[in-house]
Design a protein with these regions (language model features):
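C-terminal capping/extension of enzyme domains
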Residues: 1-15, 19-20, 45, 88-101, ...
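Short hydrophobic segments within beta-strands
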Residues: 25-27, 119, 150
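Short, surface-exposed acidic-centric catalytic microdomains
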Residues: 35-95
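Internal catalytic-core helix/loop-beta-alpha segment
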Residues: 73-132
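Short glycine-/acidic-enriched loop or helix-start segments at secondary-structure transitions
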Residues: 35-38, 125-129, 159-160
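Short amphipathic alpha-helices and their capping/turn segments at secondary-structure boundaries
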Residues: 13-19, 62-71, 107
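Short, solvent-exposed loop/turn segments at secondary-structure junctions
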Residues: 30-34, 83-86, 122-124, 153-156
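Short, hydrophobic/glycine-enriched beta-strand segments
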Residues: 18, 23-29
Length: 211
């Protein structure tokens, strides 16, 4: 990937990886330039989301970013607080986070996941106006979904290692419970992404709809 290709990806929107009735909808801050250029969520080599997802027990093996469409088969999905891609999250304005929180709330109500997991407590605080929020389960619910704030897997977040992040993600997994047996079905991203085959992994009703 050349620097020119990365720069050309600025402000690009990456479709969500979602389905109705997910066990957990993971929500990143916003797409990186690498994610926007490749179309694969958490694609930057320094991002630890995929290793942490595996080590915590959410996936039986470490998926590659290019395998993101397998996530709904495990009852998992990915979206973002802010849809547009930037080189760094600190390029975003506070109002973008607040607007993103409103869009995210509507998306969660539409899709009906059991849990919304925001991977970045600072982003969660800004998006939802909860300045005292800490890592872990939150009192807020959105529709029928409970909310958990997770540490940001970015390599810039040096306070958390893969091991300590995996422990926190595993706490969420324990709260979520075991996966059911999914049934594949076609879905379309609410952001207008192309139709893909995903799944409904639990019995909760909800309409179907990548980072």
């Amino acid at each position: 990937m050349t620097p020119e290709e990365l720069l050309a990806a600025r402000d690009r929107v990456v479709p969500d990886v979602v389905a109705g009735g997910l066990r957990v909808l993971f929500c990143g801050i916003n797409p990186s330039l690498m994610t926007a250029a490749t179309g694969h969520h958490f694609a930057h080599p320094g991002n630890r989301f995929w290793p942490v997802l595996h080590r915590s027990g959410f996936t039986p093996r470490q998926l590659k970013p290019s395998e993101q469409d397998q996530l709904p088969g495990y009852g998992l999905g990915i979206t973002n607080v802010v849809a547009r891609a930037t080189a760094r999250a600190d390029e975003l304005e506070a109002e973008e986070f607040r607007a993103g929180g409103r869009v995210l709330s509507a998306k969660v109500e539409e899709l009906g996941p059991l849990w919304l997991a925001v991977v970045g407590v600072t982003a969660y605080r800004t998006a939802f106006g909860e300045r005292r929020a800490r890592i872990g389960p939150q009192e807020r619910t959105i529709g029928g979904a409970r909310v958990w704030a997770l540490p940001n897997p970015s390599g810039l977040n040096a306070h958390w290692t893969v091991a300590t992040m995996a422990d926190e993600y595993a706490r969420l997994l324990a709260a979520v419970g075991p996966a059911g047996t999914p049934e594949p079905r076609p879905t379309r991203s609410p952001q207008g992404g192309s139709t893909t085959v995903t799944s409904t992994p639990n019995s909760q009703p909800g309409p179907s709809s990548s980072r």
